[in-house]
Amino acid sequence: MKRNTIDIITLGCSKNLVDSEKLMRQLEANGYKVTHDSDKPQGEIAVINTCGFIGDAKEESINMILEFCQAKEEGKLKKLYVMGCLSERYLKELALEIPQVDKFYGKFNWNELLADLGKAYKSEFAIERTLTTPHHYAYLKISEGCDRKCSYCAIPIITGRHISRPMEEIIDEVKLLVSEGVKEFQIIAQELTYYGVDLYKSQKLPELIERIANVPGVEWIRLHYAYPAHFPEELFRVMREHDNVCKYMDIALQHISDNMLNKMRRHVSKAETYELIEKFRREVPGIHLRTTLMVGHPGETEEDFEELKEFVKKVRFDRMGAFAYSEEEGTFAAKEYEDSISHEVKQQRLDELMALQQEIAGELSQTKIGKEFKVIIDRKEGDYYIGRTQFDSPEVDPEVLIKADEEYLKIGEFYKVKITAADDFDLYASIL
């Protein structure tokens, strides 16, 4: 057990990771040594940043808390604190059920931890973070919360209404990160396309992205978690005109059947969804689309599911994730619908959909053989350097593998490569 050392454990999404990075910077500014995502306690104090989005995430968070409680009981840890979405939603219940935790914080009051440690929040470091990602890329969170009322989603209950960060503050953070060596920015929010409506009374995402693109040193900008309804089409122009805005869009569509879109309260139709996809591909040639789909929402019939599969076959998404509906208390779906589709049927539909996408992804990968791409090198792993094209986001998308014996490559640098082979997920390349 190392004195004056604090372990930060982050569960859940990249938005949580940004919160952890901000906390880490504040702790370091107060004289602590900080470790991140250690397998076991390293220091006297541990802070677990939890996720509470769906059942599996909640279970993972609870198990991690209990694991560290056990370490505390064994004398391997002096203090244990918990923050994040799970404790934001269930703070009182958790405090009663797991008294071994010294204190639970919500998602937005983690700065109180500093006071409880006898330290102070340092406002001069408000936009600074200790990056846990490789030094050349960072996640950039532009807003908190969500004003959408999708039937199945607990995020608005947990995080509250949409709050945009001031544009100047975001630009200042970008400039600071660039000065520290960051070249690539993953722009994240619960709902990107709503950015600016609360602060500036209109959608400001295109203006924000254009301003980030104009910051010297920004090489790649990638957009995550857009919403299909009321999409700001000015963004198409920004993506066309700025080479450093990746031709990539992560837009969660969830379903295609009008029956399901209505039950999910998505405020977009099947026809509008197809029209938006066609616009993306017409206005931004070569764009790669990533989406997320859901199966097993209450009311999903076999006909709805077949319609969803046909949609996937027809559109042929470059990247796709899917998950089975999980009933979340407090949501519209939990109040109004019976969770009548069995776990077995949900899993069967999920497996079918992902098998279909794997086949499509494999076919799309084969079309890249012989083509040339610019890649950034993330790391060296065994006999390969691992890189990504502009069409690949870290952690979730395919990677480009380059034989390490070919030549020495620098982590965080860009190289031109030629694709020589492909499998269902990854590409293999040689340096040009």
Swiss-Prot record:
Keywords of the record, alphabetical order, are: 4Fe-4S, Cytoplasm, Iron, Iron-sulfur, Metal-binding, S-adenosyl-L-methionine, Transferase
The reply on keyword 4Fe-4S is yes
Any idea where the Radical SAM core domain is? 132-363
**Family, similarity comment:** Belongs to the methylthiotransferase family. RimO subfamily.
Annotated MTTase N-terminal domain ranges read 4-122
Role description = Catalyzes the methylthiolation of an aspartic acid residue of ribosomal protein uS12.
Enzyme nomenclature, EC number: 2.8.4.4
Query: A Gene Ontology CC term for this entry?
Result: cytosol
Q: What is its main location?
A: cytoplasm
Q: How is the cofactor bound?
A: Binds 2 [4Fe-4S] clusters. One cluster is coordinated with 3 cysteines and an exchangeable S-adenosyl-L-methionine.
Cofactor(s) the record lists: [4Fe-4S] cluster
Ligand binding ([4Fe-4S] cluster 1): C13, C51, C85
Q: What is the lineage of its organism?
A: Bacteria, Pseudomonadati, Bacteroidota, Bacteroidia, Bacteroidales
**PANTHER family assigned:** RIBOSOMAL PROTEIN S12 METHYLTHIOTRANSFERASE RIMO, RIBOSOMAL PROTEIN US12 METHYLTHIOTRANSFERASE RIMO
**Reactions this protein catalyses:** L-aspartate(89)-[ribosomal protein uS12]-hydrogen + (sulfur carrier)-SH + AH2 + 2 S-adenosyl-L-methionine = 3-methylsulfanyl-L-aspartate(89)-[ribosomal protein uS12]-hydrogen + (sulfur carrier)-H + 5'-deoxyadenosine + L-methionine + A + S-adenosyl-L-homocysteine + 2 H(+)
List this protein's GO terms for biological process.
tRNA modification
| Keyword Transmembrane among record annotations | no
Q: Which GO terms describe its molecular function?
A: 4 iron, 4 sulfur cluster binding; aspartic acid methylthiotransferase activity; metal ion binding; protein methylthiotransferase activity
Look up and give the organism this protein is from: Phocaeicola vulgatus (strain ATCC 8482 / DSM 1447 / JCM 5826 / CCUG 4940 / NBRC 14291 / NCTC 11154)
> Any idea what this protein is called?
Ribosomal protein uS12 methylthiotransferase RimO
Which superkingdom is the protein from?
Bacteria
Q: Which HAMAP family match?
A: MTTase_RimO
Localization, UniProt: Cytoplasm
Q: Where is the TRAM domain?
A: 366-432
Which amino acids does the record list as binding [4Fe-4S] cluster 2? C146, C150, C153
Q: Which SMART domains match?
A: Elp3
